[in-house]
Amino acid sequence: MGSFGDTSPLYVVDGMFYDNINFLNNSDIQDMTILKDASASAIYGVRAANGVVIITTKKGSRNQDAKITYNGYVGIQKATNLLEMCNSHEYATMMLEANPEAYRSIRKSVAEFGGNMENLQFNADTNWYDELLRTAMMTNHSLNISGGTEKATYSAGMSYLAQDGIMDVENYYRRLNFRAALDYEARKWLKVGFNGVFSNSQQQLPKNAAWQQAYNTPSIIPVYDDRRDDAVFPKKYTSPEQVGLTNNFNNPVATANYYDNRNETYQVLTNFYAQLNLIPDKLNIRSSYSYDYSMIRGSEFTPTYYVGTNQKKEVTELTKKNTNYYKYIWDNVATYTDKWGKHSFTGMLGASMRQEQYRLLEGTATNVPEGEDVWKYIALGNKEGATVKDDGWKYRGLSYFTRLNYNYNDKYMLMFTFRADGSSKYNDKWGYFPSIGAAWVISQEPFMKNQNIFDYMKLRASWGKLGNDKIAASAGFASIQNVQSVFGPNTAIDGFINTTNFSWLGWEVVNETNVGVNFSTLKNRLNADIDWYYRLTDNAVISPKLPMSGELLAGNNGQILNTGIDLSLNWNDKIGQDFNYNIGVNLSYLHNEVKSLKGNMKIIKGGKTVNMVGETMNSFYGYKVIGIYQTPEQCAADPIAVANGLEPGDFIYEDVNGDHVIDGNDKQVLGSYVPSFTYASMPDSLIRTSTSASLPTDKQAANCGTVSVPCAMQPTTITLTAHSMRTAGRVQALPTNIRRPRLFSKPGTNQTVTTLPIS
């Protein structure tokens, strides 16, 4: 949450830098470390501003015989905590109370599909979420071999992941990985090595619009209607129009099935290094070259179909995208280590070059032949109206860095880091970022020798600056559009269309202060880490809309604060000689705040979220309910109620500016999805050589405000949840102490999603 742009961390896998680790198999991971403070992250440069995750994969050992291991699992995935919707009886009961004209669609459901109007019983009683969802299988298999000789270590392996989606249509993810690593001591003064991964994945994506349609569409129609025998129906889906429901109502199962969206990804990741040991155990120079190439082929096809006049496709449509992404990083680092007496010293000096390039070629055509995939080519569609798009960008960076570490008797530790980072993304090409850290192992002091509470204790403190260049490679031109490289959520490569508008972009800088303590007690069975952090992002890049234009112009327009506390507790113990167990608990508190925006601007996204000074990033934005009108006299005495024809049972919105008009000027922050508190627990046990572990339990608490039950039926949507049935309306039963909004269906009313307290 430290940037208005990309907030993903940097992953360092065996010394190679990655933006994501989709290619990595979990069973290949030997160790994972999260760097929390600025002094530790600073050496990794401009991509470390959002944190660093260091991963070491499993490798062979010197003089080790070949070892073959297999790891596999089979599991299921199932949606939990689903929203409970009204059944047909509840829906009809509430609709008739809200609007007697709803009788027509309810009567049509009984006439079309059977039922009884007298007691509002329906043969059609569809739970659309149940129709869309399934229990999905997932399985993973990995086979590895590792070993080593006197001068070399090696490891190689392959893994296969198959994961089905929870939507009950053809949607899945399949991934095949091959991995190899070799380290070889060619001479006493020369060590060389190689790491490589080849990954191939196929993904079929679901039509996510079906989820919203399942929320909107009432239960009084079935999924299928076998009586519909018109030839234009590939399947006999029921249309909401059959009971008089039009506009935003669709059959979500039909939407999910009439869609074909596929991605195939080929990724090659390599790293070569050579290390020269110029002075044994003191001076070495290491040069490494990493190359990452990805090719992504995407295809989205919509066939012809007809469910109703508002849910149809008269001609096929095909869009194909080919994406190529290249990245290389060349690092050269000299490290000197020395020790005299109780003093030890390590110095590092290095340089890094990097380049990233992205190319996109996209084409769209209609009236492409249906049937086998062999016919699904852009060239076979209509030439008229076909479109072609060629897009891309290139980014370059150059960095120089140094680090000095000092350690006295493993008791006092100092660390200083300085980086000069250059980036083609900024008009101000160079940024300079220092950091400093210190640690004190108190348990090494003489005055701690006679105490028996702490087995180990260390105090830590650090301060540093980190540059962040995870912004568009636009050099300050106005970006109109953010274009996904291929369809779906699994890609993280963005493209931007630039205009002639221009701004001068300077570096986005994270200023971070950390204070922490590590201690062990009870004979090292209880270990704890406590960290307090204060992260202030200066010159945060955000893209407000230009006046009189829909264009977005990036600029250094903001300042973001993140401050909080992290607590980690781990208990390690054993019972007898063969049973070892571990219990871990993590607790976190976070305060996120937009500290400043240039010109005190208010940036509203889609009318639902806002960025404004003093509030959490991307806070919910709307009208605040302060009560419900109780009597006709109260309505008559309120100018707002009189002007809008409001009645007892309607919401009273807060008139923020006191002008007796409820409009956009009265919207305010209603809460945030960002959790203030999070916690997780992980019990683990080890019996001899077999391991059994339970899944982690994660909880979080966020101030999301309270939201009105969706009980206002507008002309385009009618959404009723089971919670609505239990809590909304019933004004007639509460004539003098109304606690629930009344049910009604009238355009322009004041019952919208707000902050109505529900109890």
Q: Residue spans of the language-model regions?
A:
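Short acidic/polar hinge/loop motifs at secondary-structure boundaries
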Residues: 9, 14-42
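Conserved C-terminal beta-signal and adjacent last beta-strands/turns
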Residues: 144, 582, 672-700, 726, ...
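Short beta-strands and strand-coil junctions in structured, solvent-facing domains, enriched
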Residues: 3-4, 18-20, 38-43, 60-63, ...
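Conserved small-residue
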Residues: 69-119, 362, 555-558, 572-673, ...
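Non-catalytic regulatory/gating segments with a bias toward low-complexity or hydrophobic composition
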Residues: 15, 32-33, 53-55, 567
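Extracytoplasmic gating/loop element in the C-terminal half of outer-membrane beta-barrel translocons
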Residues: 118, 253, 382, 699-759
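Residues embedded in well-ordered regular secondary structure
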Residues: 3-5, 9, 51, 59-170, ...
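Extracellular/periplasmic, surface-exposed regions of secreted and cell-surface proteins
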Residues: 8, 136-139, 181-190, 195-200, ...
